[in-house]
Regions:
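Short, glycine-/small- and polar/acidic-enriched structural segments
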Residues: 33-140, 210
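A ligand-binding cleft/hinge motif common to bilobed small-molecule-binding domains
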Residues: 95-108, 171-172, 197-200, 204-225
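Ligand-binding cleft/hinge of the Venus flytrap
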Residues: 58-68, 156, 160-187, 215-222
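Bacterial signal peptide processing site
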Residues: 24, 28-31
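Short beta-strand->loop
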Residues: 111-120, 180-184, 217-235
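A conserved helix-loop-strand patch within extracytoplasmic ligand-binding domains
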Residues: 117-175, 179
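An extracytoplasmic/periplasmic, membrane-proximal ligand-sensing/linker region
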Residues: 36-42, 47-58, 236, 242-243, ...
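Short helix-initiation/N-cap motifs at beta->coil->alpha
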Residues: 73-84, 97-99, 177-196, 235
Length: 295
């Protein structure tokens, strides 16, 4: 699949997701004092809070040292809250998925994409199944039709890799949400929670971010006797950093470019850099632009 085709696929999915997703939930991060020059960073809560606090706490320390400004991580309660906090100015820099990043930029004129991981240009989701479901690995996408009548869990409704793109590929192969058991999917709230509900047998099938799946397997949080991958999606573009406009006015000329460079310069050669990149499941960050997430 060419880069143009991948962008077309994700753009089609994003358009569908924007039509299906509720506009905005209330913000979980408190708005900071506009007189206090603090760079507020955030992220969609796609994994367990303990891991996110460690990751973004370490990143805040690293960025503060490199940029010589106070940097604070402000967690939010859900995906919509991340978009809302970015729109209102409570967050200056946010790690979004494909769908939430588009939502954030549409609601915040002048916001722009700064960077993505080396794995985000060709990202994939996986469908996993509980062993008792009787489902075996699919050899082609048209076998997704076997999901009809099954109990299936997505992560967040606003997740690109945990709902939007898996649902897009299901639809391409004749499976509508109402075809699932109970008349629709369940929502676990995050990728690691999807693993948990499928492994426990609460759901027969789940769809999630492949990087989180691999990380949980490596950390031995997955019982291979109870749950396994049955299908991997084609690649698409996904996660990325989005920055608000006006940071140069608050922090000084050229600050936004310095911020981008600080992200791109993260290296496994330093202790903090190695920790950050490992927790992100990446080897490095690479430049990205708005056009990567549109037609």
């Amino acid at each position: 699949m060419s880069v143009r085709e991948r962008r077309a696929v994700v753009a089609t999915g994003l358009i569908a997701g924007l039509a299906l997703t509720a506009t905005v939930a209330s913000c979980g991060a408190s708005q900071h004092d506009s007189k206090q020059v603090v760079l507020q960073i955030g992220a969609i809560p796609d994994q367990n809070p303990e891991k996110l606090n460690r990751l973004y706490g370490t990143l805040s320390e690293e960025l503060s040292e490199k940029l010589d400004v106070p940097v604070r991580y402000a967690p939010v309660s859900n995906y919509a809250a991340a978009v809302s906090a970015f729109r209102t100015g409570s967050l200056d820099l946010v790690w979004f998925g494909g769908l939430t990043g588009v939502q954030a930029r549409l609601q915040t004129p002048g916001a722009r994409v700064l960077a993505q991981r080396d794995i985000d240009a060709e990202f994939t989701s996986v469908f996993i199944a509980n062993g008792a479901s009787g489902l075996r690995p699919f050899t082609s996408a048209d076998q997704l039709v076997e999901l009809k009548g099954r109990r299936l869990a997505f992560g967040s409704a606003s997740s690109t890799s945990g709902r939007l793109m898996p649902q897009f590929f299901m639809g391409e192969n004749g499976v509508k949400p109402e075809d699932l058991a109970g008349g629709g999917p369940g929502f676990s709230g995050s990728h690691d929670a999807t693993i948990a509900v499928v492994q426990s047998g609460a759901y027969e099938v789940g769809a999630l971010n492949e990087q989180v799946w691999r990380s949980n397997v490596a950390d031995e949080r997955v019982d291979p006797g109870k749950v396994s991958v049955i299908w991997r999606t084609p690649p698409y573009v996904d996660y990325h950093w989005v920055v608000r406009p006006g940071l140069d006015e608050r922090f000084g000329d050229g600050f936004t470019n310095k911020l981008q460079s600080a992200l791109l310069d993260l290296s496994a050669d330093t202790e903090n850099g190695a920790t950050i990149l490992e927790l992100f499941g990446a080897e490095r960050f690479i430049p990205a632009k708005d056009e990567d997430y549109t037609m």
